[in-house]
Amino acid sequence: MDIEKKIELVSRKPTEEVLTVDNLKDLLEMGMPLQHYIGFEISGYIHLGTGLMAGAKIADFQKAGIKTRVFLADWHSWINDKLGGDLEVIQKVALGYFKEGMKQSIKVMGGDPEKVEFVLASEILERGDYWRTIIDISKNVTLARMMRSITIMGRQMGEAIDFAKLIYPAMQVADIFYQGVNIAHAGMDQRKAHVIAREVAEKLKYHPLVWDGKKVKPIAVHHHLLLGLQEPPKWPIEGEEEFKEIKAQMKMSKSKPYSAVFIHDTPEEIKQKLRKAFCPAGEVNYNPVLDWAEHIIFREEPTEFTIHRPAKFGGDVTYTTFEELKRDFAEGKLHPLDLKNAVAEYLVELLKPVREYFEKHPEPLELMKSVQITR
């Protein structure tokens, strides 16, 4: 496969940003073996924003000949008070429910889960020289910068936090260098940590990325954060700047079940959630149902997406590009309920293998349910 095709695979939907395409091209031209990683906190049920968005990109990286790795961030989850802050519970869920759920998500998005390396963070964090890398990074970043970076944990700047949470950004940066990762992948909300990694890359003494005797910066690939299905906290949204301000509150959230579809939801749960979704007629800028259609259904174009309607409402209609769908919705030619029903049906079919897996292997999901009940 030529270099341009590899760059196209890395850059396509749901990717929103590559830091930088030129750097990626340089690494490919140098012939440097590429190692990807994406890290996850272990916090609750896997929703589509985690499973399908990450799974789609992992599939793309594999097609581009890049080694892929999922980093199960148990210590990071402990620091960030996930699953009651109980490290043993976090580790059980990580190696049971979460690992299996991600494998199935990768599979339905066209990737090969057997070619993904799964690493539990504590396997490397408990080595002494990992912490030397943390100190090396920390000596090259100001306290103010670390304070601003706590948003990667879903925390607000100025929020009262314990001291352990200040170590978190340096740990996330260290994870990249300590594992020899040259493609750091995450959602857009993790951008600050990756920018720090790129800024300190050429200053590090311990575990820098080196190729042909030269220190190199890791590439950062950030995928789109799916909008939650709920109505935004303010409506209407007046312009792009206001949207940026409230975007964090609009993303899918495990703590708001009706904002998210989980990978093992039943067909009826999926349909019910989509029926209740915020989807104003004619609104194409801040519309979660259209957002899901764009980044899940129309990830690859052309495709065929058929919306079934009674003849009196125009009959069935098939779209091959997102722009066609968006135009008809904007012009009122497509009713919100028809769009919701069609997206729901698509997801029901897409997620069928995941549901079937958990029906045949119920133990991981039962463990997760028991943890949720006792939290």
UniProtKB/Swiss-Prot annotation:
Superkingdom field: Archaea
Species of the source: Thermococcus sibiricus (strain DSM 12597 / MM 739)
EC top class named in words: ligase
EC number: 6.1.1.1
GO CC terms in record: cytoplasm
Catalytic function, reaction form: tRNA(Tyr) + L-tyrosine + ATP = L-tyrosyl-tRNA(Tyr) + AMP + diphosphate + H(+)
Similarity comment: Belongs to the class-I aminoacyl-tRNA synthetase family. TyrS type 4 subfamily.
Disulfide bonds: none
Gene Ontology biological process: tyrosyl-tRNA aminoacylation
Function: Catalyzes the attachment of tyrosine to tRNA(Tyr) in a two-step reaction: tyrosine is first activated by ATP to form Tyr-AMP and then transferred to the acceptor end of tRNA(Tyr).
Residues the record lists as binding ATP: 254
Protein name according to UniProt: Tyrosine--tRNA ligase
Molecular function terms from GO: ATP binding; tyrosine-tRNA ligase activity
Gene3D superfamilies associated with the record: HUPs, Tyrosyl-Transfer RNA Synthetase
Aminoacyl-tRNA synthetase recorded as keyword: yes
Motif ('KMSKS' region): 251-255
Entry binding sites for L-tyrosine: 37, 168, 172, 175, 190
Entry-linked InterPro entries: aa-tRNA-synth_Ic (IPR002305), Rossmann-like_a/b/a_fold (IPR014729), Tyr-tRNA-ligase_4 (IPR023678), Tyr-tRNA-ligase_arc/euk-type (IPR023617), Tyr-tRNA_synthase (IPR050489)
Keyword Ligase: yes
Complex formation: Homodimer.
Subcellular localization(s) per the UniProt record: Cytoplasm
Primary site of residence: cytoplasm
Keywords: Aminoacyl-tRNA synthetase, ATP-binding, Cytoplasm, Ligase, Nucleotide-binding, Protein biosynthesis
